[in-house]
Amino acid sequence: MGIFAQDVVADNMLLFQRDNGGWPKHYLNKKINYTTIFSEAEKATIKDEENRNDATIDNEATTKEIRYLLNIYKKLGTQKYFKAAEKGIDYLLTAQYKNGGWPQFYPDLSSYRHLITYNDNAMINALNVLQDIVEHKNDFDIVNPKYTEKATLAVQ
């Protein structure tokens, strides 16, 4: 196990992660299926989109990936999964508005995307991730302790 242990779903999550730390909810206008075995050409196309502004918390995007990556890191010990999960946590903390809400998409705040998102449990899912950091539970006991104070402030 360790550095060379791999998980197809986790590797695909890393492939889709945006530079800002979040994840999109769609690929080719469909919900991302992380169990897909992508060709090298498809992987290159997906990787070329890593700087897009389409990261979101809608439809469990970003929060689902953070949770999965921490869980698989605990099982396999593969550091890249842990780093990607923490980058996702950074995304949640950065995207949060001062009033406590989150836009549906970040950093793309055009159109309705800047509005605080209550549908699909988007905000609840983000808050639950941060609360799990505060309480050190559901695999969040392993994240860097620096996140505890930030998450505490974010959920107040």
Region spans (language model):
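Long, well-ordered core segments of solenoidal/helical folds
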Residues: V8-G21, A84-G101, K150-Q156
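Non-membrane alpha-helical segments in proteins
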Residues: W23-K25, K31, E60-K74, K87-G88
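Short amphipathic alpha-helical molecular recognition features
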Residues: G2, I57, Y73, G77-K80, ...
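Well-ordered alpha-helical scaffold segments within catalytic/enzyme domains
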Residues: M1, V9, L14, T63-T78, ...
